[in-house]
Amino acid sequence: MANEQVFPPWFFDRADESPDTFFYAPDRLVTHIDEGAIAAVGELYDELELTGDVLDICSSWISHFRTPPRRLVAMGMNEVELRANEMASSWAVKDLNVDPTLPFDDATFDAVTCCVSVDYLARPLEVFAEVARVLRPGGPFVATFSNRCFPTKVIRGWLSTDDEGHCAIVATYFELTAGFERAT
């Protein structure tokens, strides 16, 4: 099913269409979710046993793991924030809205995480396809999200719905991407 048939033409537009490199240039060494949400994400990562080689896309200075994985590659938009990520084994600056390709070989990672940033992806189906490509067979893609956002940079489709709708949006991304068995 074509993307245009599922999402209206305006769905991936954003109020601020200026390059994300401008918006994310200032260092933000802050948490974007509260302590309860941070704890819940850490518990989820522990429950899913994300202990091997993990790629954290749309990352920043903290990756919310309670137990660090063996290898964590943090990929995000701000070099200072990524360098400050003490759990990261390595990091890369990348704007996935400009170029959604991931600079890794097929089947490189045991898991991929995207914490509170899936709503900023203007090309999510391309990103999800790349995630499926770099995951080892059976590896999870854990996309967590909240009700907080930078409203000028989040996609309009996200702003047009509620929390239940947000779950449906992300589930649809998984359903439309080859390589994922099911979204839970």
Q: Language model features by range: what are they?
A:
Residues 2-49:
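Class I SAM-dependent methyltransferase Rossmann-like catalytic core
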Residues 36, 40-102:
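Class I SAM-dependent methyltransferase SAM/SAH-binding core
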Residues 40, 44, 161-184:
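Short alpha-helix
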Residues 99-112:
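A short acidic, Gly/Pro-enriched loop at the edge of an enzyme's catalytic core
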Residues 110-125:
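A short SAM/SAH-binding and catalytic strip from SAM-dependent methyltransferases
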Residues 125-140:
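A short glycine-rich, Lys/Arg-flanked "PGG" loop and its adjoining helix->strand segment in the class I
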Residues 140-172:
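Conserved class I S-adenosyl-L-methionine
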